Swiss-Prot record:
Residues of the B30.2/SPRY domain: 138-330
Lineage, highest ranks first: Eukaryota, Metazoa, Ecdysozoa, Nematoda, Chromadorea
The name this protein goes by in its record: F-box/SPRY domain-containing protein 1
GO molecular function: protease binding
Region (Disordered) location: 1-81
Main location: other
Swiss-Prot/TrEMBL keywords: Synapse, Ubl conjugation pathway
Top-level taxon: Eukaryota
Pfam families, A to Z: F-box-like, SPRY
Amino acid sequence: MTENNEETIVPDEQCNLTSSTPMKSSDLENVESPIERKISIVECDGEGNPPIESSEETPPDLTSHSVAPRRRRSPRRPEVSASRLPLKVLNQIFQYLSLKDLRSAMLTCHSWNNALSMEDSDIWQQLLVQKLPEAAHSDPFLFVELRSARKKLRAWYFAWNTNDISRNNYIRTNGFTVHRQPVAQSTDGVRGKRGVSQGVHAFDITWDGPLGTVAVVGFATKHAALHCVGYIALLGSDDQSWGWNLVDNVLMHNGVQLGVYPKMNNPPKYEVGEKIRLVIDCDMHVAYFERNSEFLGIAFSHIPPLRLFPAVCAVYGNTEVTMVYVGSPQMG
């Protein structure tokens, strides 16, 4: 007989229990999780075959991401337009610009154009004080034809060139008068700072002191000579210059005398201190002179389209010639 307290041993097969033998790590790798099993079912087609791989990537699910909160915008600051700057502010800015930049500023907007169109405004007054020598400011006869600060400043940029001058000449402290030193057997000339190639331009020339045997006023290219030995009409002696000798009233170009000017019998001689106005019309390719506001007729025609500079040449010692650019002459 068996004892009642003996435990009945039931086989594992009847309890559907697995063996208590521990599983190996290799066995765990072969076990599919429910999630993997679900994925494998989805990835298979109806016949149990894996689906065809697609080159298109599945777009990300944006619904699962939280939307970042919007940043609070700062209050809009009022924008300051350069075209609405006060005139006092523009004056402080424009005084540091060159004439070329000022011209560009005039084409920028109506406000800047109006500020710079006032020829006697504080802008031009300040620039005039900065650029113009004190000797020119104090000369009461230098700017008789020029009233505004803008025109005076423009004349300064067209004055005699200290770097384009014969070695026997020098420019006085006012910047507009050339002085010839007493050197024997020498003809000496000078050119203006800026040349002209289009438009109509007028230059007032005044000869102070004796003329000597040669005293020529006119214009030349950048290549014309400004010094030679002897006393000759240097301005007009080659094809790069055109001149009018005030001593004998003869026009010269390319070494040829073109006749007496003005074309009349016994034309009056030049008197020291008279104002001679040289007018170069680059559009019509002609040039002429005026004496005391009197038109003397066309002096030169068929002038080639070159950049032309006002010029003079002298031979008499200690004589002086003043030249002031006045812009476009008054017609009629």
